[in-house]
Amino acid sequence: MYELVQVSEKCYYINCPAKIGVYVADGENVYLVDSGNDKDAGRKVRQILEKNGWHLTAILNTHSNADHIGGNKYLQGQTGCKVYSGGIEAAFTKYPVLEPSFLYGGYPCKDLRHKFLMAQESDVTDFSDENFPKEVEVIPLPGHFFDMVGFRMPDNVVFLADCISSRETLDKYAVSFIYDVGAYLETLD
């Protein structure tokens, strides 16, 4: 687990529970696509980056589920990187209590305020910021969560977040969370 897998000249993914994308913008500056589920994931990611001599420039969040943003705070604190997000996802990333509140229908009881539903807060910069990497295309992928997006890198590698689930994931969880079924079906088309 936490193995770096190369998929193109400049794109990799870190094989872990919530796959983390890596885009090498130049010889040493990299962008992550999501950050894993917690501080421990962030620490393992940082070790992989350091081992390869890479500097983390920013994290590009696909959506605000805790398993995709849980490493943000740790990595931001360790590297000073930016965290990019957009729309409602940016609000949920900045104020993570919103996710269990949304799922529960009110302020979540203590049993719902844990790292699997509520990541630590991140300082967020919107995708529209002038420093967002111009070579990265943001692709709207609504359905699974409010404003989920994917990213197309310059070499046409596309990171699709939770738009598509593996057989293993479907077998493990049996029921997949879909916020908007109609939007999800349109995204798959």
Describe the predicted segments one by one.
Residues 2-52, 150-161:
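Conserved beta-strand hairpin/beta-sheet module of binuclear metal-dependent hydrolase folds
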Residues 3-9, 110, 131-136:
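Short Pro/Gly-enriched beta-strand edge/turn motifs at strand-loop
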Residues 14-15, 117-125, 139-142:
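Short gly/ser/thr-rich secondary-structure transition/capping motifs
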Residues 15, 39, 68, 91, ...:
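Hydrophobic positions within alpha-helical membrane elements
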Residues 18, 87-89, 97-99, 142, ...:
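Short, flexible active-site-adjacent loop segments at beta-strand->alpha-helix junctions, enriched
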Residues 37, 135-189:
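Metallo-beta-lactamase
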Residues 42-43, 47-132:
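Active-site HxH/HxHxD metal-binding segment of metal-dependent hydrolases
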